[in-house]
């Protein structure tokens, strides 16, 4: 599995995340993916071949292994990390869409040179407006995926600890046989570590949702007490209604000025208009 590609995608989201979101990403890649790739995969690498039952009955080992380990720990954690990391891509797509709109506005304003476009790509987008909702929804989905996988893991392996010996009487085993699990202590340590890291991520997600809501409420209260001035720059200002209205007024004034210049340069047309206005006043 190529975890480097996933890290490259999420590192772009990290630039636009909160401080808690950056900590969450560090926990994901340092304490979970690195441990999963470096250590856990080697510990669980021989789980099927080293699962031995004291019987020579063909198929008994495979049936007992499937009964006690319906899904491998490593594969379950890999699926969990992929699904938990996917909602963050919503934020990356939203930011890319906003930057695309800003680049189009710069081109319409005549600032479409590569320097300005590269500056748009580098600057940090503030979490506000529709981006705030996208960010909160992504964090909530991360939280739900983490909690769901914790519950699924509890249903599959209630004790969390890896047992050394299991007794199996499933068909085609001739009777109740003893089956031995390889490296039970190592597997227990890594299981507890991964579950603890998942619990930390759940706490970070809850803290980030609370932080985003509190900060949004504080900003709204600040706007009510101190109305924002019309001056400003940046992406949010360019998309504000005041900015759009000012641009429209500017275009209208330029068109009005050009029309007056045309009337000045055409005396006949100006005289005709003056004559029409005199007739209207006489009427």
UniProtKB/Swiss-Prot annotation:
* Membrane topology term: Multi-pass membrane protein
Keywords recorded for this protein, A-Z: Cell junction, Cell membrane, Gap junction, Membrane, Phosphoprotein, Transmembrane, Transmembrane helix
Q: Name one GO molecular function term.
A: identical protein binding
Q: Where in the cell is it found?
A: Cell membrane; Cell junction, Gap junction
Tell me the Pfam families matching this sequence. Answer: Connexin
List the transmembrane segments: 23-45, 76-95, 131-153, 192-214
Instruction: Say yes or no: keyword tRNA processing present.
Output: no
Where Phosphoserine occurs, residue numbers? 233, 258, 266, 277
- Which residues are on the Extracellular side of the membrane? 46-75, 154-191
Of the GO CC terms on this record, one is: cytoplasm
Asked if the keyword Lipid metabolism belongs to this entry, the reply reads: no
Alphabetical GO biological process terms:
cell-cell signaling
Q: Which InterPro entries does the entry mention?
A: Connexin, Connexin32, Connexin_CCC, Connexin_CS, Connexin_N, Connexin_N_sf
Residue numbers on the Cytoplasmic membrane side: 1-22, 96-130, 215-283
Q: What is the similarity comment for this entry? A: Belongs to the connexin family. Beta-type (group I) subfamily.
Q: What is the stated purpose of this protein?
A: One gap junction consists of a cluster of closely packed pairs of transmembrane channels, the connexons, through which materials of low MW diffuse from one cell to a neighboring cell.
Record note on quaternary structure: A connexon is composed of a hexamer of connexins. Interacts with CNST.
Q: What is this protein called?
A: Gap junction beta-1 protein
Species: Equus caballus
